[in-house]
């Protein structure tokens, strides 16, 4: 059955703008938020729907952590909700959780859960990111409390700052302490993350805990080049399992997010979950959480190298995504890209197209607190703010979105769910409204709604197309969801 709805948006968009600026921040989401659990390579909500996450990072790296007046404001959250973002990767850290050996900072947990509650009240799924860069303040970094690491910079060592401080012998010695648990750093970190997990138990909007941001291999880093480091990854996987066990001892059902070691960002493959090199994954609700950065872009941003090198980003990111595909295939786990972009709009398409092809969610780096103006009104926002299925009452198929004109097409196969499919319609791409066409189902939302709801007519495939009035629209790509980078030019 074909249903067509045309939204006459001149009036509707104006009304929406007024409503978005006057509605109180306490307004609840239309569909109450539920926990997310892993189901094969997808995340599924409490209504039985497959969830796709589009969101941002918000990470406070420096003490005092999350002080009053410096957290996400109601206006910040309004911006995120208005643009259809449904997740925030919210930074926490070992140093914030346990500033003194063995002592959890309960006041900090109060502040952190206050931010969590403000986000989840608006329908945002929150990933708690145990963040670090450069290990500890001793090296000008952040993350681990200074009491947890005995190594210190030596007088003769120059400190080149991020990211080159990872080459400092003393910093590598500090990481060796972590992986060897020489002075109990992993034990104490497990206690801290366990306290965090216990505090957020029963909060359905918490989608999980990311155990450690961008873990560095320490003095074994050279062994990771040029083809990955199975010996270190064996040590690393054991450490992640240790932290997972500590978290699950306090909150048995909370999902945990594992990153690969950070040489992944330098194109090295991960050996996680790769028998016989490393153990097969047997723990439930583990989500793979890689980052997708373009090295030339990062070198231009942080070291001032020529921006023309960004032309190398496409083949580099193809390799990164082939490494993601390898993990997905062997471990059968969901993937969420928990960092990418770093303010560089020239590389956003590379990540977003590949994520769309694979029905993989993402969290953009970075969205700060206290925004006086909307940061998504430029080219970065035009890529990130997308029409997409936030929740699918069925098995997702192929999807495509054209960021230039807003043409969107999506196909899914229905299955039992207690709520309908929900598709967010970008508020940036349809200045004169949008048209919806559905084959195999029907629209149940009001004309011009920001969330289009769709129910299937039967058990056959459902195809949804959304575009500007008069546009020829997009066609759903043939075949199943991509599992390789061979078709990575589809969406933009």
UniProtKB/Swiss-Prot annotation:
Domain of life assignment: Bacteria
Membrane topology of the entry: Lipid-anchor
Active site per database record: 214 (proton donor), 339 (nucleophile)
EC code: 3.2.1.123
Disulfide bonds: 224-229, 294-313
Leader sequence residues: 1-14
Region (Disordered) residue spans: 467-492
InterPro entries referenced in this protein's UniProt entry, alphabetically: GH5_C, Glyco_hydro_5, Glyco_hydro_b, Glycoside_hydrolase_SF, Glycosphingolipid_Hydrolases
N-palmitoyl cysteine: lipidated positions: 15
UniProt keyword terms in alphabetical order: Disulfide bond, Glycosidase, Hydrolase, Lipid metabolism, Lipoprotein, Membrane, Palmitate, Secreted, Signal, Sphingolipid metabolism
Consequence recorded when altering residue 265 to A: Severely decreases enzyme activity
Family: Belongs to the glycosyl hydrolase 5 (cellulase A) family.
Function of the molecule: Hydrolyzes glycosphingolipids; exhibits broad substrate specificity including monosialodihexosylganglioside (GM3), monosialotetrahexosylganglioside (GM1), fucosyl-GM1, lactosylceramide, globotriosylceramide, globotetraosylceramide, ganglioside GD1a, and ganglioside GD1b. No activity towards glucosylceramide and galactosylceramide.
Protein name per its UniProtKB record: Endoglycoceramidase I
UniProt organism field: Rhodococcus hoagii (strain 103S) (Rhodococcus equi)
